[in-house]
């Protein structure tokens, strides 16, 4: 069966929560994608959504250059749900009134009182208000504009504490709007509201499930590739490993993996993957040692974006050289996932900037007769891991912390040198070993060390020590789109720090990063 026959389209107005919204929809078993606000009619028809959700955004409908909803969207005859800015722009374009407020802005947790019945909200509430006797919701808001007059044929079904419009509905046309964010966990009944819209109003069925996803990827790959030969860029990370196992199931031995040792890897981690593949996966893997080639290309390069581009370019060169030595290869497979696409600014709102480039987004261009194959391009990391478990990958490998494509190059600030990589590998090993020993590794989403290109004074015995500084980074996250720094105990951090400065003689100082995403990214570069 096609696991994405029922689907929701999210029109993205630049909200920081858009990707979280997509995950919430998929958690309900319904496929979702986001698109730019200026999507064409033909693209929407091709996607064939059962319903549309309009995201929030940082803009004001009062400003002339703000993004808007294409008029044809309202003529599709399918349910539409506007969130925050999405509700405001829908109201504005349909004849309602939106005004900017100063004293009555709302940012954070607040309450909404339900005024009237609606299929959209019936029986969904957190408590009964003691004063009014009405049902109420605990919600999360973040807005400076408000809808002061709803469009014709709309009903106000909920208000905030200032009696401003918080929910509106046009039941006949299945158009709905809320001023708050149902996709964030602070809105306690947010999941119920999304589920009501998606399953009851849009009538979507829950078919986006792991077993169905695997079957669809396998069948689509077989149809697309046929009898052609495929080469896969294999890093040993969960994304490329799952891609390899899916290709193995789909096309057998029609593909070969190429693993490039660029000197920027955490080798002790890859040894485990290599052994697992040899014993369980029956994969054909070519191992290439190209360490010096990468280090030579990175000499004198300090800018992180340039480092990413150079690593991607050299990877491309090595792959192209190897592919030319292989017979009849027609496809290049990559373990690109949805978050790679998002952060690279591909297929997103034109109001979003590229956060960072990804070496595995966009493919290789030097060989004109080879096509790009990205089986897991539309999957989030947690979906990839679930598929991995279903394919027989052990839990500790499937949930191994992510390792960036450019490797240690973006965990070394400034110029990359082999000696820095060697230091960082030893430090990182200590940090991860202690996390596992204290049973913290599986509770943390990602942890690693960062090499800071500065010296700091220390004391070792009676000797003055002037050595390098290391930063430790550990975060907790669900989807890697947002993250909070992990609260590690002082005793644990003290133990790790002592081991590092005593066992790695090149290091004199250790610091701990307490920055969340946003505003910081998880990786330092």
UniProtKB/Swiss-Prot annotation:
Residues 7-207 form the Glutamine amidotransferase type-1 domain. Its EC number is 6.3.5.2. Pathway: Purine metabolism; GMP biosynthesis; GMP from XMP (L-Gln route): step 1/1. Pfam families: GATase (PF00117), GMP_synt_C (PF00958), NAD_synthase (PF02540). CDD domains: GATase1_GMP_Synthase, GMP_synthase_C. Residues 208-400 form the GMPS ATP-PPase domain. SUPFAM superfamilies: Adenine nucleotide alpha hydrolases-like (SSF52402), Class I glutamine amidotransferase-like (SSF52317), GMP synthetase C-terminal dimerisation domain (SSF54810). InterPro entries: Class_I_gatase-like, GATASE, GMP_synth_C, GMP_synth_GATase, GMP_synthase, GMPS_ATP_PPase_dom, NAD/GMP_synthase, Rossmann-like_a/b/a_fold. It catalyses: XMP + L-glutamine + ATP + H2O = GMP + L-glutamate + AMP + diphosphate + 2 H(+). One of its GO terms (molecular function) is ATP binding. GO terms for cellular component: cytosol. ATP binds at residues 235-241. Keywords: ATP-binding, Glutamine amidotransferase, GMP biosynthesis, Ligase, Nucleotide-binding, Purine biosynthesis. The keyword ATP-binding applies. The active site is at 84 (nucleophile), 181, 183. Homodimer. Catalyzes the synthesis of GMP from XMP. This is GMP synthase [glutamine-hydrolyzing]. It comes from Blochmanniella pennsylvanica (strain BPEN). The lineage of its organism: Bacteria, Pseudomonadati, Pseudomonadota, Gammaproteobacteria, Enterobacterales. The gene is guaA.
């Amino acid at each position: 069966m096609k696991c994405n026959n029922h689907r929701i389209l999210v029109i993205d107005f630049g909200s920081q929560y858009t990707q979280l919204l997509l995950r919430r929809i998929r958690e309900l078993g319904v496929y979702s994608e986001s698109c730019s606000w200026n999507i064409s009619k033909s693209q929407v028809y091709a996607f064939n959504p059962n319903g549309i959700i309009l995201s929030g955004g940082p803009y004001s409908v009062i400003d002339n250059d703000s993004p808007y909803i294409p008029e044809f969207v309202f003529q599709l005859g399918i349910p539409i749900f506007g969130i925050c800015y999405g509700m405001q722009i829908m109201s504005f374009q349909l004849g309602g009134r939106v005004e900017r407020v100063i004293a009555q802005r709302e940012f954070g947790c607040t309450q909404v009182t339900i005024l009237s019945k609606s299929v959209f909200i019936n029986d969904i509430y957190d408590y009964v208000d003691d004063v009014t006797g009405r049902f109420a919701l605990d919600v999360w808001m973040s807005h400076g504009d408000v809808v002061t007059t709803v469009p014709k044929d709309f009903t106000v079904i909920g208000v905030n504490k200032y009696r401003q419009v918080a929910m509106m509905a046009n039941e006949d046309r299945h158009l709905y709007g809320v001023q708050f964010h149902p996709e964030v966990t602070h809105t306690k009944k947010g999941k119920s509201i999304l589920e009501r819209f998606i399953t009851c109003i849009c009538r979507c069925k829950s078919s986006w499930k792991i077993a169905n996803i695997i079957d669809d990827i396998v069948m689509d790959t077989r149809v697309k590739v046929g009898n052609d030969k495929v080469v896969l860029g294999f890093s040993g990370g969960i994304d490329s490993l799952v891609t390899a196992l899916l290709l193995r199931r789909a096309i057998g031995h029609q593909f070969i993996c190429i693993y490039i040792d660029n000197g920027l890897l955490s080798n002790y981690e890859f040894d485990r993957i290599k052994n697992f593949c040899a014993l369980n996966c029956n994969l054909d893997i070519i191992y290439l040692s190209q360490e010096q080639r990468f280090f030579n290309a990175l000499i004198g390069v300090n800018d992180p974006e340039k480092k990413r581009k150079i690593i991607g370019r050299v990877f491309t060169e090595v792959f192209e050289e190897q592919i030319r030595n292989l017979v009849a290869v027609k496809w290049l497979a990559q373990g690109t996932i949805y978050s790679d696409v998002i952060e690279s600014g591909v297929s997103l709102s034109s109001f979003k900037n590229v956060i960072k480039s990804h070496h595995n987004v966009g493919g290789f261009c030097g060989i004109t007769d080879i096509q790009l194959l990205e089986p897991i391009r539309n999957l989030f990391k947690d979906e990839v891991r679930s598929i991995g478990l279903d394919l027989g990958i052990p839990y500790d490998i499937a949930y191994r912390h992510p390792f960036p494509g450019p490797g240690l190059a973006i965990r070394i600030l400034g110029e990359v040198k082999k000696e820095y990589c060697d230091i960082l590998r030893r430090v990182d090993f200590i940090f991860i070993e202690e996390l596992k020993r204290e049973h913290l590794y599986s509770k943390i989403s990602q942890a690693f060390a960062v090499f800071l290109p500065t010296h700091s004074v220390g004391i070792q015995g009676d000797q003055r020590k002037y050595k390098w500084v290391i930063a430790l980074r550990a975060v907790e996250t669900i989807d890697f789109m947002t993250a909070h720094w992990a609260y590690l105990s002082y005793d644990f951090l003290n133990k790790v720090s002592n081991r590092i400065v005593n066992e790695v003689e090149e290091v004199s100082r250790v610091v701990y990063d307490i920055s969340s995403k946003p505003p910081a990214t998880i990786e330092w570069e």
